[in-house]
Amino acid sequence: MQTYLVGGAVRDRLLGLPQGDRDHLVVGATVEQMLALGFSQVGRDFPVFLHPKTQQEYALARTERKQGRGYTGFVCHASPEVTLEQDLLRRDLTINAIAEDEEGRLHDPYGGIQDLEQRMLRHVSPAFAEDPLRILRVARFAARFHAQGFVVAPETLALMREMTDAGELAHLTPERVWKELEKVLLGQTPQVFFEVLRECGALKALFPELDALFGVPAPAKWHPEIDTGIHTLMVLAQACRLSPELAVRFAALCHDFGKGLTPPAFWPSHHGHGQKGLPLIRDFCERFRVPNDCRDLALLVSDLHTHIHIAFELKPATLLKVFDKADAWRRPERFAQLLDACRADFHGRTGFEERVYAEPDYVAQALGAAQAVPVKDIVAAGFKGEAIREQLAKRRFDAISRVRDEWTFIDEE
């Protein structure tokens, strides 16, 4: 019986990166032997065990045979006769198919170390094409290791394109797609994920709302990058810089979906695009079963981001309506997320990365002043019933007006 450290722990150590979970591979053992050594079995589809002391995962060496469509149609075969090379052959990328034995020796039958040195994401074997989920995984790895200079090998990208053209992505479950998307959005450079998917055609197959934005122009004065798809990925990058929160990053991704519906005759203007994008966002979220907090913020950002951008032009009564519509009184934390997404939208433009954008600060101060209006004073003044609500709105209006009078507005021209 031989035990090896495999997968991400070996890869990340060789890259000089912090190691995450330590997964182990056991060659030449049976289930009975593992149980006799005190391991507890947790795998249902194939034999995976937890170490009695460290609780790290140990899996018996296995092979996989495709039987059916999609990423779940596999039959696994684990036995003492399965070799290290056979087990590593079933893995997705060469950089994930390196093993380290108990003496610290590396076993690299498929050139993973060389690909680490060359910063290349390359598939291990043609069996890569049997699992459509690997298209998303490769794109996610490209995003994850972008800072280290990794790119997808041309032959792997070509295989991903063939898989996409064959309709393999249709066999992925919504939950699995969202799980990959969630991991990507919580990373450092999620825009790379979408760039890779676009290169292999998977963006159009999975996320047509986003793919439709590429090639759609916006006014050069406000969008020197011109292309709305490029702008969206720039906004996503800015959202990652501004906020670690999944909902903010997802809202940044969806905020301009409505521009994909603008008839070319009206380009580069996109009047009302925020409202036009709402049905697209709802459909996207329903399709992939996106969590409610992400969906709700994305809808708010799409609907209201243009209002925030022109906040200095809004009358206090209009700003009060924005607060009401966003339920800012009861959900101030979500409203702060809305402002972060608007900041990302403003700065996610060529040449606008460091420009002053004071509107969210003004809006936040106006909201704070309106929130500070004490209801108890209105009640103490003798107002009752509907009159309380009317008086509260009036005093909030006055509070916003005072903030507005105190601000020196910035001319962006």
From Swiss-Prot:
Domain of life: Bacteria
InterPro entries in alphabetical order: CCA_bact (IPR012006), HD/PDEase_dom (IPR003607), HD_domain (IPR006674), NT_sf (IPR043519), PolA_pol_head_dom (IPR002646), PolyA_RNA-bd (IPR032828), tRNA_CCA-adding_enzyme (IPR050124)
Cofactor note: Magnesium is required for nucleotidyltransferase activity.
Keywords: ATP-binding, Hydrolase, Magnesium, Metal-binding, Multifunctional enzyme, Nickel, Nucleotide-binding, Nucleotidyltransferase, RNA repair, RNA-binding, Transferase, tRNA processing
A molecular-function term among this protein's GO annotations: magnesium ion binding
Cofactors demanded by this protein: Mg(2+); Ni(2+)
Ligand binding (CTP): 8, 11, 91, 137, 140
Stretches assigned to the HD domain: 228-329
Any one Gene Ontology BP term: RNA repair
Binding-site residues for ATP, renumbered to this chain: 8, 11, 91, 137, 140
Entry binding sites for Mg(2+): 21, 23
Reaction it catalyzes: a tRNA precursor + 2 CTP + ATP = a tRNA with a 3' CCA end + 3 diphosphate; a tRNA with a 3' CCA end + 2 CTP + ATP = a tRNA with a 3' CCACCA end + 3 diphosphate
EC number: 2.7.7.72, 3.1.3.-, 3.1.4.-
Quaternary organization: Monomer. Can also form homodimers and oligomers.
Matching HAMAP family: CCA_bact_type1, CCA_bact_type2
Function of the protein: Catalyzes the addition and repair of the essential 3'-terminal CCA sequence in tRNAs without using a nucleic acid template. Adds these three nucleotides in the order of C, C, and A to the tRNA nucleotide-73, using CTP and ATP as substrates and producing inorganic pyrophosphate. tRNA 3'-terminal CCA addition is required both for tRNA processing and repair. Also involved in tRNA surveillance by mediating tandem CCA addition to generate a CCACCA at the 3' terminus of unstable tRNAs. While stable tRNAs receive only 3'-terminal CCA, unstable tRNAs are marked with CCACCA and rapidly degraded.
Note: A single active site specifically recognizes both ATP and CTP and is responsible for their addition.
Family, as annotated: Belongs to the tRNA nucleotidyltransferase/poly(A) polymerase family. Bacterial CCA-adding enzyme type 1 subfamily.
Entry note about domains: Comprises two domains: an N-terminal domain containing the nucleotidyltransferase activity and a C-terminal HD domain associated with both phosphodiesterase and phosphatase activities.
Protein name as catalogued: Multifunctional CCA protein
Organism classification: Bacteria, Pseudomonadati, Pseudomonadota, Gammaproteobacteria, Aeromonadales
